A protein has these predicted regions:
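SIR2/sirtuin-family catalytic core signature
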Residues: 34-104, 112, 377-481
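A broadly conserved detector of short glycine/acidic/proline-rich loop/turn motifs that flank catalytic sites
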Residues: 11, 18, 316, 401-402, ...
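Extended, H/D-rich, highly charged conserved domains that either
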Residues: 88-368, 373
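Long, low-complexity intrinsically disordered regions enriched in small/polar
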Residues: 1-39
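Generic recognition of cysteine residues
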Residues: 3-5, 121, 260, 432, ...
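Intrinsically disordered, low-complexity regions enriched in polar/acidic and amide residues
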Residues: 12, 22, 137, 368-370, ...
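Short hydrophobic-aromatic micro-motifs
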Residues: 15, 310-312, 397
């Protein structure tokens, strides 16, 4: 029997009309129950804290840029192999492999640079111009990338038939040119030297994803969100191969993140370790009941530190059967045996053929590029987030580089024109550039200062970007009124 997914309806399901004004907003009371939104707006905290991937990275988890290479390595472990085998047993004839995806991405970009070349070249050039903290090796790598890519662009531009040349061709030969260039670049082969240089750069970016230069190559190479977007469309087209691939990618991502949280929980949770680092971001948020936390991370660390934390993109503790409209929950992912879950529990819940169809997927936010694909659960979270941002007098952003293309969330922050905004990040230049683009400010109009021993820049008399390491930074000055 062909799998035809019913993706509409249900408490935590995908709703096609979710953006309509008549959509009902439901509040979550913290006990797993939903209720109608109260008539009066609930009180809001003075300070709002927004957590990004940099906060989890500070306690040992991979950054978003490191995610796919880390998953590839983990799938080579005994645990990873067992989970991969269990999933493939359920998802028959699955062809997707993370390691092959990485190799194909490198080969594809090395052979055909037209799609990404100009974007990478522009971003690297901007990094070279504005980042005064690059060391000599980073500047040389950046210069090499720009020079190599520019030479390709120059050759292509030089071969173009401009208007003057086109007119001369008509006058001399009486013919109208039918091509735009004098070279067929589809048949042009790069030399082995060039291919080896590009492959070296791409391979280097896999293992040095935080490099200020190489990250511009890397983010155009491997992007877990783009990967999920690519296969999420299968739920709309009814294509089983795409559905199976999405199930595999999302469950492997979930399993790897649970594995990482289990390994690092002792560093974060004082209930299991008395010597936990209370100076970590999560340690410093504990007991701050007057502060609202919004996290973009999937781990439970935010909820451990602040039970009222809002999970903007989803959480590891929830998953959903999108076919039968059932919300499912993990009581304790720290004691969860991943192998047992994938060999015993998930096979009972997942069914793609026969009379019973059931499609459980991790409760990750459906990719934002699919703007009409949102659920009632997320509308609730986003509404509460929007209200918290709107009423906050101080917004503290930690480890999250807000970018202009994140329009949905960026608009929430931009619309509060009175709040004091503090962003703390290791990369001052990039953080300033991204935040200024988001808030429509000039990145060069700032006052340079030192706050609590850290370099900082102040914009618009209310926005401060601080360069600091979140694993050691004392947040007390910003967490107190």
């Amino acid at each position: 029997m062909e799998c035809k997914s019913d993706i509409y309806g249900g408490t935590n399901q995908l709703l096609p009309n979710a953006t309509h004004a008549e959509q009902h907003i439901h509040y979550h009371n913290g006990d797993g129950e939903h209720g109608a939104a109260p008539a009066a707006t609930p009180p809001h905290p003075h300070t709002l804290v927004i957590l990004g991937a940099g906060v989890d990275a500070a306690v040992g988890l991979p950054t978003s840029a490191q995610l796919i290479p880390s998953i590839v390595d983990w799938l080579e472990t005994e645990e990873g192999k067992a989970i991969d085998e269990a999933l493939r047993k359920q998802l028959r004839r699955l062809s997707f492999r993370f390691d092959k995806f990485v190799d194909d991405a490198i080969d594809r970009l090395a052979k055909d640079l037209d799609r990404e070349r100009d974007t990478i070249c522009r971003n690297v050039r901007e990094e070279l111009e504005r980042n005064i903290h690059l060391d000599e090796s980073q500047r040389k790598m950046g210069s090499l990338i720009v020079r190599i890519f520019q030479k390709i662009t120059e050759v292509k531009n030089g071969a173009a038939i401009d208007e003057e040349t086109e007119e001369l061709i008509r006058e001399v030969t009486g013919m109208d040119p039918t091509d735009n260039t004098i070279i067929d670049f589809t048949k042009l082969n790069y030399t082995d030297t060039f291919k080896n240089i590009i492959t070296h750069i791409l391979r280097s970016s896999l293992h040095d994803s935080d490099n200020p230069i190489l990250r511009h190559v890397y983010k155009n190479l491997l992007d877990i969100e783009q990967l999920l977007v690519q296969y999420f469309y299968g739920f709309f087209t009814g294509r089983q191969p795409q559905i199976k691939t999405y199930l595999y990618i999302s469950w492997v991502l979930w399993a790897y993140l649970v594995h990482c949280e289990q390994e690092n929980n002792d560093n974060v949770n004082p209930n299991v370790n008395d010597d936990v680092n209370l100076r970590s971001v999560y340690g410093q948020l504990r007991g701050k009941d007057d502060i609202q936390v919004v996290t973009f991370n999937y781990t439970t660390f935010a909820a451990q530190a602040s039970p009222s934390a809002l999970y903007f993109n989803g959480t590891l503790t929830e998953y959903v059967d999108i076919e039968n409209k059932n919300d499912l929950h993990f009581d304790d992912i720290h004691s969860l045996d991943l192998r047992t879950f994938f060999t015993e529990r998930l096979p009972q819940e997942l069914s793609l053929t026969g009379e019973r169809i059931a499609i459980p997927v991790p409760s990750f936010m459906p990719p934002m590029k699919l703007k009409t694909v949102i659920s009632e659960h997320y509308i609730n979270v986003w509404y509460r987030t929007s209200e918290a941002i709107r009423h906050a007098s101080r917004i503290l952003i930690l480890g999250h580089s807000i970018q202009a293309d994140e329009r949905f969330f960026s608009d929430m922050v931009r619309n509060n024109r009175d709040a004091e905004i503090i962003l703390i990040d290791r990369d001052l230049d990039t953080a300033c550039h991204n935040l200024c683009c988001t808030l429509q400010l000039s990145p060069n109009r700032y006052t340079s200062l030192v706050l609590h021993g850290c370099p900082a820049r102040k914009y618009d008399n209310r926005i401060t970007v601080v360069q600091a390491d979140l694993s050691t930074t004392d947040l007390t000055p910003w967490l107190t009124s």
